[in-house]
């Protein structure tokens, strides 16, 4: 009976720890600049700074500014990463960085910010 109780406790501990192991193997994307709700200058000269930790299926990232075609960024092994954003018009913009597989399928790992251009 004591062995069975120890075995049960072992299973419970393993089950509780498994979400931690899953989180370690998942990728992550953090946008460091611009901050969420930042105010940017109109025109060119705005940068996007971000960190990427690819998940097991990740190969590169796609960067979206509003509904524009994605910017494919492959050199994520040396992050922190930085790119020049395309020229932005006045108004509110959403910037999303999404992890993609080698065949460009989205993995679900992403980071996003909203910024206003004055």
Give residue ranges: language-model regions:
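Beta-strand signatures of extracellular beta-sandwich domains
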Residues: 60-64
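Surface-exposed, short loops/turns at beta-strand junctions within beta-sandwich domains
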Residues: 85-92
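Hydrophobic beta-strand segments within extracellular beta-sandwich modules
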Residues: 95-96
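Structural beta-strand segments of beta-rich domains
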Residues: 42-48
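Short beta-strand segments within Ig-like beta-sandwich modules, predominantly Fibronectin type-III
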Residues: 71-79
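Short, compositionally biased P/S/T/A/G/V-rich stretches that sit at domain boundaries
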Residues: 23-41, 118
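Short strand-edge motifs at loop-to-beta-strand transitions and within beta-strands
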Residues: 79-83, 113
């Amino acid at each position: 009976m004591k062995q069975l109780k120890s075995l049960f406790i072992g299973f419970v501990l393993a089950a509780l720890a498994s979400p931690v192991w899953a989180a370690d193997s998942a990728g992550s994307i953090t946008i460091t600049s611009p901050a969420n709700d930042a105010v940017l200058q109109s025109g060119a000269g705005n940068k996007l700074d971000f960190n990427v930790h690819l998940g097991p299926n990740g190969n590169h990232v796609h960067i979206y500014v509003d509904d524009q075609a994605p910017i494919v960024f492959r050199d994520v092994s040396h992050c922190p990463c930085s790119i020049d954003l395309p020229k932005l018009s006045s108004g509110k913009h959403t910037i999303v960085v999404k992890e993609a597989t080698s065949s460009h399928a989205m993995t679900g790992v992403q980071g996003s910010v909203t910024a206003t251009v004055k």
